[in-house]
């Protein structure tokens, strides 16, 4: 079985990458191909249900290999813990990350109400999953303290500030800014 989809962090900028044939010429295996990308009207839930029908396992249910922090679903970007750090860095630069993206999609599809999407976004969007952060730092050979110092230097302080607990949050989401 072959799943096609976009994985931007790995598909772009791979200098020296070699394109290989996806079918072995001598193979007589039957291959089922499912395209899960920019189809319209695109439905994240339809894609999830179609993938589940052919054996996809998400992180829900009895698969407690990872209880993600700062996410509102357990079926996207689950191949690598570190993926989520990329998403989280959007938050400290722009004030929104993957939670907002998914909440908007689910609201458009009628899975969430607008109020539910806003609440989930405001509650989770600022959180960086600690397991993802550890994995990301380990992959780069840096300490979490070094990572935090880099974030501190590049955070968009027009939009983001630390709350009283030291968490980066959008300024409009808390009353007592450090200022």
Regions found by a protein language model. Name each.
Residues 1-179:
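Nucleotide-activated chemistry modules centered on ATP-dependent adenylation/adenylyltransferase
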